[in-house]
UniProtKB/Swiss-Prot annotation:
Membrane topology reported for the UniProt record: Multi-pass membrane protein
Protein name: Reaction center protein M chain
Organism field: Cereibacter sphaeroides
Gene Ontology CC: plasma membrane light-harvesting complex; plasma membrane-derived chromatophore membrane
UniProt record, GO biological process: photosynthetic electron transport in photosystem II
Protein family membership: Belongs to the reaction center PufL/M/PsbA/D family.
Cell location: Cellular chromatophore membrane
Segments passing through the bilayer: 54-80, 111-140, 143-168, 198-226, 260-286
Entry keyword Transmembrane helix: yes
Residues given in the record as a ubiquinone binding sites: 253
Function: The reaction center is a membrane-bound complex that mediates the initial photochemical event in the electron transfer process of photosynthesis.
Keywords, alphabetical: Bacteriochlorophyll, Chlorophyll, Chromophore, Electron transport, Iron, Magnesium, Membrane, Metal-binding, Photosynthesis, Reaction center, Transmembrane, Transmembrane helix, Transport
Chain residues that bind Fe cation: 220, 235, 267
């Protein structure tokens, strides 16, 4: 007899469009509700809109587009304005930061890193504007600021790579270039210059939390899908009248590993696992070159690497 596994299949039930909170809200500030999308319904809610951008949202989108446009123009220039070459070599093009001799100067010529500085400015404005928008939207809805703080952890790693560490090292040349393969080359070279990042304990912690995040996400997703036949994905019903879904899910994990997370606790585990990926990763990058020149030598001094 066939079973309903609910791994790929999705039942889409459509009712009236949900406008969200409308009490004491000026609906003129929101976009109208768009159509329903079957494709979006495979991944989440099929309803499009309403969308609220606000001043920070508009600023972020504009700055993000300018960042994308600046890099795109440079790649187009590197391709000699040839569309065939542009498509062929897209992954090889790169917008590099200023050379070491320019230090932290903003006076580098456009073709020698000046354009990288301009692109980085737009990216800085775009990311921080979007973070501010995330914070203010949560505040407007009376929610906690958990999403904004989690986003801040990712911003921390990005800031360390592109701004904080280069400033501490005294040169924009320490920053990451904009490009596909050049980004990978920078990562490889960074590890070689600083004596193998595998001996950086914060790098190890970051990888451990990354694996942990993947494991927790898979465990949580699989558990809810496994009890969806009992209504386990219907959060309101599970709060008011749990039925058998929550109990079966909890019992499964007690049978499997001796204890189970709670409906709330699993999300606390998940957010900390995810946040610590970029938090510890940023610390590891920041210490490289500023505090520890060679992680292999550091490992030798601390009994983590062979002495010969």
């Amino acid at each position: 007899m066939a079973e309903y596994q609910n791994i790929f299949s999705q039942v889409q039930v459509r009712g009236p469009a949900d406008l969200g909170m409308t009490e004491d809200v000026n609906l003129a500030n929101r976009s109208g509700v768009g159509p329903f999308s079957t494709l979006l319904g495979w991944f989440g809610n099929a309803q499009l809109g309403p969308i609220y951008l606000g001043s920070l949202g508009v600023l972020s989108l504009f700055s993000g587009l300018m960042w994308f446009f600046t890099i795109g123009i440079w790649f187009w220039y590197q391709a000699g304005w040839n569309p065939a070459v542009f498509l062929r070599d897209l992954f090889f093009f790169s917008l590099e930061p200023p050379a070491p001799e320019y230090g932290l100067s903003f006076a580098a010529p456009l073709k020698e890193g000046g354009l990288w500085l301009i692109a980085s400015f737009f990216m800085f404005v775009a990311v921080w504007s979007w973070w501010g928008r995330t914070y203010l939207r949560a505040q407007a809805l009376g929610m906690g600021k958990h999403t904004a703080w989690a986003f801040l952890s990712a911003i921390w790693l990005w800031m360390v790579l592109g701004f904080i560490r280069p400033i501490l090292m005294g040169s924009w040349s320490e920053a990451v270039p904009y490009g596909i393969f050049s980004h990978l080359d920078w990562t490889n070279n960074f590890s070689l210059v600083h004596g193998n990042l595998f001996y950086n304990p914060f790098h190890g912690l970051s990888i451990a939390f990354l694996y942990g995040s993947a494991l927790l996400f898979a465990m949580h997703g699989a558990t809810i899908l496994a009890v969806s036949r009992f209504g386990g994905e219907r959060e309101l019903e599970q709060i008011a009248d749990r039925g058998t879904a929550a109990e079966r899910a909890a019992l499964f994990w007690r049978w499997t590993m001796g204890f189970n997370a709670t409906m709330e606790g699993i999300h606390r585990w998940a957010i900390w696992m995810a946040v610590l990926v970029t938090l510890t990763g940023g610390i590891g990058i920041l210490l490289s070159g500023t505090v520890v020149d060679n992680w292999y030598v550091w490992g030798q001094n601390h009994g983590m690497a062979p002495l010969n």
